[in-house]
Amino acid sequence: MNIKFNLIIIILFILFISNVNCKKIKNKKHLTPQRLRRFVEHSKPISLNKKVWKITEIENIFSAQIELTFGIRQRNIVELEDFVWRVSDPNDSLYGSYKTFEEIKEWVKPLDESIDAVKNWLIENDINEFTVTKSGDFIRTIVSIDKAEELLSVRYNKMVHKLSKQSFFRSLDPYTIPRELYDHIDFIGGVNHLPLLSPRPKESSGSAGGGGGGKVNGIGYELESLRNNKQIKSFNDKKVAARNGDPYLSPDLIRKEMNVSQTSTNSTHLGNSQAIAQFLKEYFSPSDLKIFQYRFGLEPSQVDNIIGPNQNLNPGIETALDIQYIMAMAPDVPTWIVSTGGLHEGQEPFLDWLVDLSSNPKLPLVHSISYGDDESSIGLAYTDRVDTEFKKYAAMGRTIVFSSGDFGVGCNDDCDSFSPGWPASSRFVLAVGGVIKKKDGSIIGDEISGGGFSNYFSRPWYQVDECSSYIEWLNGSLSSFYNQSGRGFPDISSFSENVVILYKDKLMPIGGTSASAPIIAGLLSLINDQRLQKNQSPIGLFNPLLYKIARDHPNSFLDIDFGENNYKCCTNGFKSKSGWDPVTGLGLPNFDELVKYCLE
């Protein structure tokens, strides 16, 4: 009797376990036992900050569409990185000996069998409409949500950003691909990774104007006054200041603070160029740019090229800031706007930007981007592939400038570790932090200035001494909050509060490292111009030269030794100190000194 009873219990237990496992499999759509044998997971589930994002159902998975981007595995990536380090090292005999677009394209182009394997897989799954980029490194297609779920064994949701109300279709599930494709695909965009959202330029807290900053200290700057009043060639910090007494910053005052002489801004080389990147319907207003230039006594100049969509009558604050200040710093340098992606739930604008650049043989020399996210919200496969794209740009002598972010060190919900930002944490971009000019004339690190040490990327050789010195200075404090062997950022800083732009016919003081990045990018364009005039190469990946100059000629920087980036992160943050620190980097550039050593 006992034997029969025990046997029944065992059988019931086996049936129960089998039922549980079947339910687990069914919970992952289309993932049958046969598929498990033939397919392999190619991504890891990402963490979603539920304080920032709301998860909802997609109303109709058959009509809703998603754009999938397949990053095809490229060749010679190790050799590419070695080459980048050599052409970026001022002590190397190959310094500045960049490759052309076509040379890079042929060097790293995926194998034909990799491209064909992915194309055949799509066709086998009744996906016959897709495009392959000129360089062969990306394949893109638009499919229904239902088809994407079937293809990748995932379940999509609608993710709504609680602050901006922007929504995107994404999955929290790791996707699967056929085992035989594992070595042909780096990542698939449009599945897990949420689009990068800008650390939006905010109206500076000291503004006396409402709803767009139309007033400064009671002085109204409406369109009518712009027509009737004389130019404002510079703001006088004694007469025009925010409520807290800190001065508003005009292009002229910013140049003075960074020692940019008038002769330095005279750009003449036709081979020079610069660009800003804009996503999420951040459009450009030629009218705002024209009035901004007139109002501040700047030389009139126009945008030379707009890649992608633009709606003149629907401008964005981010675009106004970026274009007005990159051109204010480098007024005669040919300037592009690369505009990608609207607000469609199925798009990934940052990835669109990368794909567009990877197919363009006439890339501008300097790019300014004011968008980012936490490293922890992004998969390693995605960041590694994006890093490869940055390496390709560096190998061609291009400079990529990112704002370091507007949330200080960032932190997790438990306040027991910092959350570094990305792409600012990449070793192959120049990350720009923020500083504030105070009413007493001092300049300090901005508490919002994104900075810290990467959890993904190891420390590059060009900043080992600087980061090690800072960590030694910490003397063990905060050691559990950050990765002591990670890439340190930012690299350099500029002004991030009370920077005045013109938006929808009104002058408006704004804040954020979104202001810092285009200011620095414009100055790098000036350096490129002077190098090109002397038949020297463009600066490319500037970081190795920048850190070398800081060691050999520290007078090229205004060292910022006060400030802490503990913005909204409990009570912890990094502090500024003499030398490099993860609040302001190497400090504020002393431009006329810096450019001298860039020409040696």
Curated annotation (Swiss-Prot):
Instruction: Tell me the keywords, alphabetical order.
Output: Autocatalytic cleavage, Calcium, Disulfide bond, Glycoprotein, Hydrolase, Metal-binding, Protease, Secreted, Serine protease, Signal, Zymogen
Disulphide-bonded residues: C411-C570
Q: How is it modified after translation?
A: Activated by autocatalytic proteolytical processing upon acidification. N-glycosylation is required for processing and activity.
Q: Which positions bind Ca(2+)?
A: D559, I560, G579, D581
Q: Which reaction does it catalyse?
A: Release of an N-terminal tripeptide from a polypeptide, but also has endopeptidase activity
Q: Where is the Peptidase S53 domain?
A: 248-600
Put simply, this protein is called Tripeptidyl-peptidase 1
